[in-house]
Amino acid sequence: MKTKLWLLLVLLLSALIFSETTIVVHYHRYDGKYDGWNLWIWPVEPVSQEGKAYQFTGEDDFGKVAVVKLPMDLTKVGIIVRLNEWQAKDVAKDRFIEIKDGKAEVWILQGVEEIFYEKPDTSPRIFFAQARSNKVIEAFLTNPVDTKKKELFKVTVDGKEIPVSRVEKADPTDIDVTNYVRIVLSESLKEEDLRKDVELIIEGYKPARVIMMEILDDYYYDGELGAVYSPEKTIFRVWSPVSKWVKVLLFKNGEDTEPYQVVNMEYKGNGVWEAVVEGDLDGVFYLYQLENYGKIRTTVDPYSKAVYANSKKSAVVNLARTNPEGWENDRGPKIEGYEDAIIYEIHIADITGLENSGVKNKGLYLGLTEENTKGPGGVTTGLSHLVELGVTHVHILPFFDFYTGDELDKDFEKYYNWGYDPYLFMVPEGRYSTDPKNPHTRIREVKEMVKALHKHGIGVIMDMVFPHTYGIGELSAFDQTVPYYFYRIDKTGAYLNESGCGNVIASERPMMRKFIVDTVTYWVKEYHIDGFRFDQMGLIDKKTMLEVERALHKIDPTIILYGEPWGGWGAPIRFGKSDVAGTHVAAFNDEFRDAIRGSVFNPSVKGFVMGGYGKETKIKRGVVGSINYDGKLIKSFALDPEETINYAACHDNHTLWDKNYLAAKADKKKEWTEEELKNAQKLAGAILLTSQGVPFLHGGQDFCRTKNFNDNSYNAPISINGFDYERKLQFIDVFNYHKGLIKLRKEHPAFRLKNAEEIKKHLEFLPGGRRIVAFMLKDHAGGDPWKDIVVIYNGNLEKTTYKLPEGKWNVVVNSQKAGTEVIETVEGTIELDPLSAYVLYRE
């Protein structure tokens, strides 16, 4: 018996080891341009594995051919046709090939989503047709057509022809015979036509459905969308002007596959479908089912306020039931201006996720409600760490609902993610909740976290990721309700990839703009959020950002708004550093960052704090809050100091400690000591916390946080990303130094001047020298109790003597200590330690 079992095991292992899957892929491009195009293929079933690139090695009468051999028996693989190293995708969506008996042969047509298992017709077709307005349709064709031949063109609505007025080239620089055409109709498409089958027919071409794009802008709806709850009834509203019909499916349980009730929704105009369901639906789950563009789609609500685990279903909730005790009296810290904020960036799991945090609810929302937690050597951890440090605001990496990962799995070592793959923007992420299946629990726990932080005077800034979503098509509630409309696409129907994440949201579309404004105002009103950081803010159009600012500051003028003034590589910037002046929206100051730490792209390049050469002018620009200080060299992008976020590190790229360590290792002229690296760390903190503008600290920067040199730890385990409180104990002097600097800034308004005029009046640069920046804040700047304050940064690797202005000066910050207590009193000159900062004052 044992022999038979052994033989069976050998046979099974042999089958796995020696089996092979062969896939033949035929690819046809209508433009005949194959250079650079290749395949990315990955195993899906029965086992999922990483992908690999495969080249086309042959050709036939259809086009190019690739023969792909995989050393395992597969039944399904994923496939992407891509240009070079992800320069572009032929089709935006991931596609899949079904395999039988270890073999598959497929045909792929340029720009066509369907994968063919038999050789398809390659005759001309309409790639994509889109309605730009009620009279204008633009279409991209596989082959050129003569626009002078209007008689070739026909547009039908449910089979009924609409007269064509004229046909012209869509690109005015093109010639008349072109594959990009504009069709102008004699009659306008009506609102009811949007829900019908509109088809473009060109003689000699395969016809195409017309996708409604900018035409939908005319059907803006300014009312409340989603599930509008009351104990007596719930009103369901969804915006889908292109759907023939919409139903709401009601479920008693999140795992149910069959609804207990199906309710037909009624079209109310302006693209909105509505259904009223009587009774108390608190805790009921729901989905929408819609038919548009010839497909029946089932989706969660893009306006979901609550969901079941892993966003399987939306949920109706009585939000009043989710409020912790005393919620009506909860308030965040009130500040006069952004400049009063000291921002500290954290991730929910990072700050309490490791064993040595001493927190019970490790890595969860409730972990940040636990008080008086201790770590190694009795150092404070979690919430208590934030309170001891003294920061005014925490910037929390995404904690809205994101797609990646299983919310029921709390093993952050096995699975971890920053959360920059949005799915449902108005719902808290379930992975940080004690019970993701209960739609009320995650909401209540976020509120408890916010309340606990507010209790200690700490505001909550939410990291929002509007420029892209995790996926498109079936992986996007936007695309399910109104395909294509919410995204930027090109003339061929391909999703633009300005974000570098596979798609980019069209913030300029009125209903997308409404969604963004609705989302941030909802978080403020329901969760008492105190600010927002906008990921890839440069991809959001200026009008939308201004509407966000107006809406939020109407609620609370102290809400802090800032973001990344860039997008993906090479993307056009719509709201960059040059756009923030006068908007009450701040931008991350990458010039100041690089001056302090050196290039984020080349770890060996030293910044000012490591003795880097030629950084003095850029440091000065940062010191003055990036305003136009002198109209010459000391000027930058800001009209007001509130518009610059001054930072040296954040979750992206290397931590400050890791960056400086790598720069030290690359230094062929010098052996760096740990003490010198600590000095660089402290000098960076001193520059940030004594400069005008808004200081921003990467969580753990205050105790030399390391991620073991991982410069993109978005999915690294918690052992890499977590706050290691052993390091806080090890570098407690660096922590105390930052704590003292924060106390100094909070108690002295001279470091928090509120406008450019005050800065130019009260801030005077003093003689410096190579790698020295010195300035005076004079005449009780900002109403400061100290008459004059001198700040000196020494970026030299050796001690330096500096001549002080006349008088006796009280030192409150030197290379070892920082705070508001006098360390010593000096006159005439002061000896500056290497890589150090000094703050001195006189009455």
From Swiss-Prot:
Q: Could you tell me the superkingdom of the organism this chain comes from?
A: Bacteria
What EC number(s) are associated with this protein in UniProt? Answer: 3.2.1.41
- List the Gene Ontology MF annotations in alphabetical order: carbohydrate binding; pullulanase activity
**Site positions for Transition state stabilizer:** 652
| Pfam families from the UniProt entry | CBM_48 (PF02922), PUD (PF03714), pulA_all-beta (PF21653)
Q: Can the keyword Hydrolase be found in this entry's annotation?
A: yes
Name the keywords, alphabetized: Glycosidase, Hydrolase, Signal
Catalytic residues, per the record, are 535, 564
- Signal peptide stretch: 1-19
Q: Which family does it belong to?
A: Belongs to the glycosyl hydrolase 13 family.
Name of the protein described by the UniProt record = Pullulanase
Gene name in the database record: pulA
